[in-house]
Curated annotation (Swiss-Prot):
Entry protein name: Caveolae-associated protein 3
Domains as described in the record: The leucine-zipper domain is essential for its localization in the caveolae and for its interaction with CAV1 and EPS15L1.
Lineage: Eukaryota, Metazoa, Chordata, Craniata, Vertebrata
Post-translational modification: In vitro, phosphorylated by PRKCD.
Tissues of expression: Skeletal muscle, liver, stomach, lung, kidney and heart (at protein level). Strongly expressed in mammary and epithelial cells.
Domain of life the protein comes from: Eukaryota
Any GO molecular function: protein kinase C binding
Positions of region (Interaction with CAVIN1): 1-84
GO cellular component assignments: caveola; cytoplasm; cytosol; protein-containing complex
Composition bias, Pro residues: 200-212
InterPro entries from the UniProt entry: Cavin_fam (IPR026752)
Residue numbers of Phosphoserine PTMs: S62, S70, S165, S166, S173
PANTHER family on file: CAVEOLAE-ASSOCIATED PROTEIN 3, CAVIN
Family as reported in the entry's similarity comment: Belongs to the CAVIN family.
Gene this chain is encoded by: CAVIN3
Length: 261
């Protein structure tokens, strides 16, 4: 209203050199007051706008803080998920390695099981009642004797050792075989003594057989042969029946042959 009042009409200007009219002064003051009021109103509007802007800025700042906090929580969650994923991958690798080791162990166990099954079948074949392996197959073979040892051992000892090595033969068959071999040896000694010609020897004593003297004649040999035959007949069978492995009988027979020669 004041502006309208001020703008109603043109203000009459005072003369250049004359006194200023009071109405002009009042109008000028009113214009200045109106301008100051408008300026204050504008400043208030600007202040209100600035307050609104400050509130919006504060709201934006709070939103940014919440966003940063959510980002922090998200980053922590992602870090935990990554750590869990690494642990899961390590557990998966360990489980795979264990599976590989178990597969190798299973293969070894299968191989051992196959060997055990094969050995079990072999034992079944070995110890089967119908076809049982004789005990002589598991005995250690005797060491071979040299020529010197064989020469020292008598023929009866060799026969006795051969008889003892065969465990499957009964005792009666061994005794019969030894008796038969003894009789054969006696017969061979008889033939050897009857076929050889030389000086007659005195009848042998049981302690030591006598040696032949150089002055004996060859004519007395036929007379001494009947005396030798009855002495040699009973001795070898008795020795073979009582103790077939005794070396005295073989040595005595060899000494008798040397004495006859």
């Amino acid at each position: 209203m004041r502006e309208s009042a001020l703008e109603r009409g043109p203000v009459p200007e005072a003369p250049a050199g004359g006194p200023v009219h009071a109405v002009t002064v009042v109008t000028l003051l009113e214009k200045l007051a109106s301008m100051l009021e408008t300026l204050r109103e504008r400043q208030g509007g600007l202040a209100r706008r600035q307050g609104g802007l400050a509130g919006s800025v504060r709201r934006i700042q709070s939103g940014l803080g919440a966003l940063s906090r959510s980002h922090d929580t998200t980053s922590n969650t992602l870090a935990q998920l990554l750590a869990k994923a690494e642990r899961v991958s390590s557990h998966a690798n360990a489980a795979q390695e264990r599976a590989v080791r178990r597969a190798a162990q299973v293969q070894r166990l299968e191989a051992n099981h196959g060997l055990l099954v094969a050995r079990g079948k072999l034992h079944v074949l070995l110890f089967k009642e119908e076809g049982e392996v004789p005990a002589s197959a598991f005995q250690k073979a005797p060491e071979p004797l040299g020529p010197a040892d064989q020469s020292e051992l008598g023929p009866e000892q060799l026969e006795a050792e051969v008889g003892e090595s065969s465990d499957e033969e009964p005792v009666e068959s061994r005794a019969q075989r030894l008796r038969r071999t003894g009789l054969q040896k006696v017969q061979s000694l008889r033939r050897a003594l009857s076929g050889r010609k030389g000086p007659a020897a005195p009848p042998p004593t049981p302690v030591k057989p006598p040696r032949l003297g150089p002055g004996r004649s060859a004519e007395a040999q036929p007379e001494a042969q009947p005396a030798l035959e009855p002495t040699l007949e009973p001795e070898p069978p008795q020795d073979t029946e009582e103790d077939p492995g005794r070396p005295g009988a073989a040595e005595e027979a060899l000494l008798q042959m040397e004495s006859v020669a």
